[in-house]
């Protein structure tokens, strides 16, 4: 997004591992009631949010008040004090990258199995469209953003054991490696789940929950792309009015 994130390692003596699988400490208001959480990450989350909003509105027929695409952090094994996961303009103990998380876009799926399968297929198809061919394999659209904070990751309930995983495999049109992940942990040795060309980590979103990003990251222009005011202002104001992008307790920049 803004170059390789600088990782400040967390003190080893402070145990802030994610303790529960029920989303404790994670965002509890980002999704409308009755939906299940999935997330997709591959580089800077700004432009990816717009891509998924387009899928929701144009392919799934969701109305603006029904949209679920929000940016945040996920797939790390730790949180900061008080369960916080923040961008890097904050207490170093809460930095998302140092805690092992990646930038992702959260999306909501119906609890109806048939509907959910159609939704995850649409999201997965768009996700794999967000890569381009290179001599070394499939590269994301913003390769200047490097490191585990920008790694390719998909979070679905149950991970590779999810019934959705087969759909992910079917939509993997370029044959990228789908690698089972258990969450990235940062240490002096480096990441346990790194940013690897042509590889997508697939994790269990019920074990590794989504942490909503700060308000100023939501409905943002893309890298080198200016989006319409209907997206930047009107849609953001609507979602804000629903109470779904309230301050997270992390430092905020002008909104």
Q: PLM ranges: what are they?
A:
Residues 2-255:
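Flexible coil/turn and secondary-structure edge motifs
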């Amino acid at each position: 997004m803004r170059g390789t994130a600088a990782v400040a390692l967390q003190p080893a003596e402070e145990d802030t591992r994610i303790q529960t699988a029920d989303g404790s400490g994670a965002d509890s208001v980002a999704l409308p009631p009755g939906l299940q959480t999935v997330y997709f990450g591959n580089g800077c989350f700004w432009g990816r949010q717009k891509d998924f909003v387009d899928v929701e509105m144009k392919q799934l027929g969701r109305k603006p008040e029904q949209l679920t695409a929000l940016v945040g952090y996920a797939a790390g094994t730790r949180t900061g004090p008080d369960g916080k996961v923040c961008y890097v303009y904050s207490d170093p103990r809460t930095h998302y990258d140092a805690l092992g998380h990646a930038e992702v876009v959260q999306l909501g799926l119906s609890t109806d199995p048939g509907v959910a399968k159609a939704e995850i297929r649409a999201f997965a198809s768009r996700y794999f469209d967000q890569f381009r061919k290179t001599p070394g394999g499939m590269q994301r659209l913003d390769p200047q953003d490097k490191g585990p904070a920008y790694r390719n990751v998909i979070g679905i309930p149950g991970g590779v054991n999810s019934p959705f995983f087969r759909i992910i495999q079917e939509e993997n049109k370029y044959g990228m490696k789908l690698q089972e992940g258990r969450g990235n942990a940062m240490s002096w040795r480096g990441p346990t789940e790194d940013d690897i060309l042509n590889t997508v980590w697939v994790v269990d979103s019920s074990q590794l929950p989504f942490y909503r990003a700060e308000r100023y990251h939501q409905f943002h222009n893309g890298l080198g792309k200016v989006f319409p005011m209907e997206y930047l202002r009107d849609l953001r104001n609507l979602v804000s009015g629903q109470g779904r992008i309230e301050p997270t307790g992390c430092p905020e920049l002008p909104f």
